[in-house]
Curated annotation (Swiss-Prot):
Subunit structure: Homodimer. Component of the RAG complex composed of core components RAG1 and RAG2, and associated component HMGB1 or HMGB2. Interacts with DCAF1, leading to recruitment of the CUL4A-RBX1-DDB1-DCAF1/VPRBP complex to ubiquitinate proteins and limit error-prone repair during V(D)J recombination.
Name under which the protein is recorded: V(D)J recombination-activating protein 1
Main location: nucleus
Keyword Protein biosynthesis: no
Positions bound to a divalent metal cation: 603, 711, 965
Chain intervals with Basic and acidic residues compositional bias: 39-54, 87-98
Gene: RAG1
Organism of this sequence: Sus scrofa (Pig)
Family: Belongs to the RAG1 family.
Entry binding sites for Zn(2+) 3: 308, 310, 328, 331
Amino acid sequence: MAVSLPPTLGLSSAPDEIQHPHIKFSEWKFKLFRVRSFEKAPEKAQTEKQDSSEGKPSLEQSPAVLDKPGGQKSALPQPAFKPHPKFLKESHEDGKARDKAIHQANLRRLCRICGNSFNTTGHKRRYPVHGPVDGKTQVLLRKKEKRATSWPDLIAKVFRIDVKADVDSIHPTEFCHNCWSFMHRKFSSTPCEVYSPRNAAMEWHPHTLNCDICHIARRGLKRKSQQPNMQLSKKLKTVIDRARQARQRKRRAQARISSKELMKKIANCGQIHLSPKLLAVDFPAHFVKSISCQICEHILADPVETSCKHVFCRICILRCLKVMGSSCPSCHYPCFPTDLESPVKSFLSILNTLMVKCPAKECNEEISLEKYNHHISSHKESKETFVHINKGGRPRQHLLSLTRRAQKHRLRELKLQVKAFADKEEGGDVKSVCLTLFLLVLRARNEHRQADELEAIMRGQGSGLQPAVCLAIRVNTFLSCSQYHKMYRTVKAITGRQIFQPLHALRNAEKVLLPGYHPFEWQPPLKNVSSSTDVGIIDGLSGLSSSVDDYPVDTIAKRFRYDSALVSALMDMEEDILEGMRAQDLDDYLNGPFTVVVKESCDGMGDVSEKHGSGPVVPEKAVRFSFTVMKITIAHGSQNVKVFEEAKPNSELCCKPLCLMLADESDHETLTAILSPLIAEREAMKSSQLMLEMGGILRTFKFIFRGTGYDEKLVREVEGLEASGSVYICTLCDATRLEASQNLVFHSITRSHAENLERYEVWRSNPYHETVDELRDRVKGVSAKPFIETVPSIDALHCDIGNAAEFYKIFQLEIGEAYKNPHASKEERKRWQATLDKHLRKKMNLKPIMRMNGNFARKLMTKETVEAVCELIPSEERHEALRELMDLYLKMKPVWRSSCPAKECPESLCQYSFNSQRFAELLSTKFKYRYEGKITNYFHKTLAHVPEIIERDGSIGAWASEGNESGNKLFRRFRKMNARQSKYYEMEDVLKHHWLYTSKYLQKFMNAHKAFKNSGFTINLQRSSGDTLDLENSPESQDLMEF
């Protein structure tokens, strides 16, 4: 008797005679003795177990199978028909899915970082790869001030593994306790060695037939192999798999529906969110779905977007993540509250413009979603009263005694009203509305002190310092950015208040003070200079075409563009200029023209080598070019009125750096290559006028440049003259050394930049076909092309240094009585020097130096020093000569040292000619052994040219290079402070910091800060010493202010 199969099995097309009677039993037997490799994934098994518990018996639970013996075999012949190709394909795909599920189950037992199995490690603890860090790690990171808050960031920082792009089917989702311990040891300060669990990152691949992970998992346990049932039909297997898949799809659909209902219950937002049914327009279903929350299916309220690009209401997604775990409710991709972001603005604008119907009765108004809350609150105001009536129960607490959460709950209605008002009237500025309301309440209750403090905070002038004050403190105390940031964090952590401003606020304040911020214009435009005004620090070598044939320039140079730097300097002095105009009874609206006199200085520095920084091999010497705004006048009527004059022209606080280069000043080619563009800008500015808006009015400025801050070595270099040992002794006149020694006093200034250029052309072309000596005598020592125009003058500082060096030599010769023995040996002269050094150290506390400097010269040139030296000289006659020589020198010195000799030392100025002639007479008689037929360069300039320069310029000391020399000390200090890995950036830091140090705007803040700081101390200086406290603005005095 044939047994007919049900049509659902797919065999109804086969005739009854070929169907075996024991097919049903064979199916049960296959289910009972199924091979291990055909087992289902754990998730499917659990689902089937749940279904079976609901009262749906499966084949395994059938009592008929349990009664049969296990060893019974059926003789089922091979079926005479082929299975349908569709069934074979579905069976193959089901096998693939089953293998993938087994692969994922194996992955869950492995560590994502090191690949070890959780079963082999000693600890059973696991940590999610995509989760936030645990409490212990968070405490450790907070101590170390690290910003990482999630495991992906921490794993990327420690192991250099990016887990954000992981896929669950390829990568494990957890890591082991060993890797967790490794990260802890990495960030903890315990003195133990840290070993990485792996030398290289673990590589994970998709599942394949020869998958290593599944192969190792199968090899774990040995089972007795079972003989496959050869009588089982492939067609029956396909039929069973299809039935199983149908059941699984049904269960998944039911689970999906139940999970969606569960999420709606968790969100519980029916009272606060709007249903899509309230939309005024009947939109397509897809559009409604796109603007609806995928959890509660309401219109999106305060929408947020996950990393997998699904959009939810903020309240709904946060509640679901808290209850159901850290995964997206739509796609189950890992998701955390920190990953939520606001959608794009275009989507929000579309959402806010949707029109919805008002759900209130007797209101048929349609309003936009953006104004819905304000509209609904207007309905509530008419019905509700704000006076709370306590109807018994728990007593009502005061607002200030509540927790923050309870305060939010109680003030929720008020907060919504304030927000609606701010959105409507103040552009959404809720903070300003609340602060103003609080301020009005304080004023109404006569609490004006608190009101004044609140008003200061609202204006940004609270208890903290202004960014400009903080910048002034940082610059004047020589703090680098990193040092200031450490101080800022320390003060904020200790006091709990933000007294100092963060670095980004200081950088915004810097931009206003640095060149390249203020717009300006030149009339006519500068020749060969760009018209752009936003030019900051530029490379000093920019514009140089470097080729194989060119001279190799091994240097690093950074500079400002000359015109941009002058504009920044003038804007920095804006208050001083306007105040000067008011002091001269001039109107503020006068637009000029103003005439600005600029002193230029340039000097070389030796031994600036540093042992750090990458970059090219550059000379261990530097050259600095700087300028000082000396005087500003305005044309008023027929005269020029002075509105500004630099009070301390030789201070480093007013000597602004323009160009820094690591080069040797003796390297003529490098010097001309870097300074030539700067000189070209200077020459272009001479014939043009600057149009600059100052005080809201467009004003005109003209510039006069005076190159006086050069020592004699650099003057000879840039004016094309021979070196200092030349026969032509002077840079101001054509006298030779012999002529100057025979005529010590009566000379006049004859040299000029134009004349030097003409003489260079004669030297180059030799038009008269003369010999070298004749040609040299004709051009008076000009041997190179002059490229910088300098003013024929004397540098007061180097004049002091040169004259002190000569007096130091005279002291040695007098100790050895060289007037008796002019041909002494070198050993004797060294002995005289050693005797002098020892005596000066003992009597005057002057330590011997290798090279004369300004401080040593200042201490050496005194009457006390002469008296000490006279103790070593036996002859009384020589005592008198030496004392008279020093006395004459000390009478002449104030004339070239003072900024305005006509006011400061008029008597010395009147007697200068007499004193210089007497000084020259002493040199030619009493000290004839030293000055017969020769004289030093600075003695010649001191005796012959000082009165003429004073008559022409009014001063020598004010135009000296002392400010630039002090700037050299600042350069060394800034270079140590701003040590960087790259020498290029280091030079930029030094130039920028030095420019800020010379800012008058910052100096005013710093002076006010000093005065405020000193006002807290009661120091009676007159009672203690009777002297005034002299705090000079120099790097040495600034050491007192270091933090």
